[in-house]
A protein has these predicted regions:
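N-terminal auxiliary interaction/assembly segments of multi-subunit proteins
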Residues: 1-198
């Protein structure tokens, strides 16, 4: 079960400072010609939930490991599984926008030490979407960091498309008005019968 837990507008450094040295970030991008974004979308999945998902992928029960070290570092195999999980999530992320705009998200790479990498301007505005994930025996959080400039560009594109749609709607209204005002002869046959006269 997944539901939106929070949406916050922050500066990037507030998101970055909340990450620990052992945290892993997935970087994603939008594949769309008119929205070539230089800033990545950052995705952070809490390690306990991530390990539960991996265990279930490998046929396990997804039992949480209560003895997990807070500074646990993912193995190479786990990093590959992490990339697979994020790649699958990208398809669903695109579907969440499809009523407004067609966006295709794709996985770019994984950062194993995000505290040393400046991916977005330190003072840039970002929107953090927190998704609460619940399994029968585990729960945790997935956080998506969406650059404010990217969202502004997306909303601008949506506004343009809405403007084009309303123009099309105006023309269709004109067409219907001219059809209503036109003269049209209608002949209808209600029934046919045969009568014998004998």
């Amino acid at each position: 079960e997944i539901e939106v837990g929070s949406i916050e507008e922050l500066h990037y450094y507030e998101f970055s400072n909340a990450l620990r040295e052992g945290d892993v970030l997935a970087l994603a991008k939008i594949d769309r010609e008119d929205l070539q974004e230089e800033y990545p979308i950052l995705i952070h999945l809490a390690t306990p939930v991530l390990l539960t998902m991996m265990d279930r992928m490998m046929g396990g029960e997804g039992e949480p490991d209560d003895s997990l070290d807070p500074d646990y570092k993912l193995t190479d195999l786990e990093l590959n599984l992490y990339a697979d999980i994020i790649t699958d999530m990208m398809a669903f992320l695109g579907r969440s926008w499809e009523n407004y705009i067609t966006l295709n998200f794709s996985y770019v790479r994984t950062e194993t030490n995000p505290t040393l990498v400046q991916l977005i301007g330190y003072d840039d505005t970002v929107v953090i979407v927190g998704l609460d994930i619940r399994f029968p025996n585990s729960s945790g959080r997935l956080s998506m960091c969406l650059p404010g400039e990217m969202l502004t560009n997306i909303f601008t594109e949506i506004s343009k498309q809405t403007g084009h749609r309303s123009t099309g709607e105006d023309k269709s209204e004109e067409i219907f008005d001219s059809l209503r005002d036109s003269d049209l002869e209608i002949i209808a046959e209600l029934a046919r019968t045969k009568i014998q006269l004998s």
